[in-house]
């Protein structure tokens, strides 16, 4: 009996060690002398405004967590919806496909969809629209049809958005539209034969030690693309750190070289006239990343 208890304790310790191995290292604040009082002020400032929600805050410096705080009802294991930050994960998958040679940024979007999914008559602009246009939110689709696409289980999301009128020539103007992200997710699936979620779990999440995740799918079984990914605070921090290191994790290249810089560089201006350069919204948009 004693041997069984000792074995169980050893297995429990081993399991705990394995879980902790996936965590980012925590800084010794006494050793580093880092003052975290300003981060406390951020928490207080944000939570004092009834219109804002802050569930958690994690600050990473030099690869170490120097501050983390969770509001009541949340903890380090809580999975939180990333909303539009999910778009950056779709972009990550596109980058992997481009790096593998399975996609090109200048590929025509309509080439990945069946005649049944496309309008009976293809406009010049729809035929012109590329993967890159979708990435930088310049598809020509002005109206976001998320509500319409998600209003019933029978809707074919791709067919619905592709039938939508385009208001400007693709690649010329910025218009934020979450259905661009869904089209990218669908294109990725057609080009690679696997869903964005399957690819990222295998090629990105596994090496980063991200083990808990929840995804939202269309009725067609395709990741929503523009929203609907749930991760823990630390998992999101790991992705940020991966991009800060040009896609390299513990000496291993995860993302194609240069992709991190490419997605984070301004690819299009929200206001080409530059009428309000101090507005963060008009600071430029990358490949599904704000710059």
Kindly give the residue locations of the regions a language model identified.
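Sec-dependent N-terminal signal peptides
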Residues: 4-13
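Bacterial Sec-dependent signal peptides at the C-terminal "C-region" and cleavage site
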Residues: 15-25
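Active-site SXXK
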Residues: 63, 80-109, 134, 184-188, ...
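Active-site helix/loop module of the DD-peptidase/beta-lactamase fold
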Residues: 100-139, 163, 192-227, 231
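A small/polar active-site loop signature that marks catalytic segments
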Residues: 139-218
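Active-site-proximal alpha-helical segments within enzyme catalytic domains
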Residues: 180-187, 227-248
């Amino acid at each position: 009996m004693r041997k069984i208890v000792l074995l169980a304790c050893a297995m429990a310790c081993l399991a705990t060690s394995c879980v902790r191995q996936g965590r980012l290292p925590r800084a010794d604040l006494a050793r580093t002398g880092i003052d975290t009082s300003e981060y406390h002020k951020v928490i207080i400032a944000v939570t004092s405004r009834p219109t804002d929600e802050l569930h958690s805050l994690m600050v990473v410096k030099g690869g170490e967590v120097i501050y983390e705080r969770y509001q009541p009802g949340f903890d380090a294991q809580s999975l939180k919806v990333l909303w539009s930050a999910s778009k950056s994960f779709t972009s990550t998958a596109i980058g992997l496909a481009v790096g593998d040679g399975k996609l090109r940024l200048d590929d025509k979007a309509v080439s990945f969809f069946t005649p049944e999914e496309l309008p009976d008559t293809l406009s010049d602009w729809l035929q012109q629209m590329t993967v890159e246009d979708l990435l930088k939110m310049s598809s020509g689709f002005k109206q976001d049809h998320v509500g319409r696409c998600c209003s019933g289980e029978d809707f074919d999301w791709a067919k619905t958005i592709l039938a939508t009128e385009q208001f400007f020539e693709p690649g010329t103007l910025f218009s934020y539209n979450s259905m661009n992200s869904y089209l990218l997710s669908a294109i990725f699936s057609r080009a690679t034969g696997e869903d964005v979620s399957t690819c990222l779990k295998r090629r990105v999440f596994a090496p980063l030690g991200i083990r808990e995740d929840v995804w939202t799918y269309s009725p067609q079984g395709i990741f929503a693309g523009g929203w609907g990914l749930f991760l823990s605070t630390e998992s999101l921090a790991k992705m940020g750190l991966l991009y800060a290191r040009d896609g390299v994790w513990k000496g291993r290249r995860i993302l194609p070289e240069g992709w991190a810089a490419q997605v984070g560089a301004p690819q299009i201006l929200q206001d080409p006239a530059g009428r309000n350069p101090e507005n963060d919204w008009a600071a430029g948009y990358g490949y599904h990343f704000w710059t």
